[in-house]
Amino acid sequence: MKKTMHLLVILLVLSCCNKKDDDTPVNPIDQLPPATQTGENTFGCLLDGEAFLPGPGPLTLDCVYQFVSGDYYFALKADKEINLNLVGVGLGTQKLQIEEGKTYELEELHDGNAVGRYAFEIFTNYTSTSHSGEMSITKLDMEKNIVSGTFWYDIEDQDGNVHQIREGRFDMTFSE
């Protein structure tokens, strides 16, 4: 009987031990999706050192690559709510055809350029010559409408704060 009581006490103590229930990785980069190239519709980056993933809900992740009036336009955006504010990160081209295996400088928003985008509520800002970055297209499949790549950039917001977007990756199916 005494052995049974000891065993019950040990089992009770062990069952009360608190294993961390949250298995979310603590390293922000480990929270990002893997860099795939199969059209998984994934997007992630580090925004000022914190993991940025599209938020739950409709219209939080969108990708288009279109040929309009003789020119190509690429647009990728991801949005999420942070502290009750809508925050968006994205990439795009204006009258610029993208190609697999090519790296593009993210600079000012004008014809022939690739740009990075940061949005906070109603304000949208784009990369510039003084706050720039790069986007690399690692896969472009026009038959399956898949575009994948990596990116990083610095961007200044409407208040003059410079945000660092790092370790960005995307694997999207795009609409035309």
Regions found by a protein language model. Name each.
Residues 36-41, 69-72:
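A short, compositionally biased
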Residues 52-53:
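Short, isolated positions in well-ordered beta-strands
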Residues 133-176:
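C-terminal or internal capping secondary-structure element at the end of a domain, subdomain, or sheet
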Residues 1-17:
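Sec-dependent bacterial lipoprotein signal peptides
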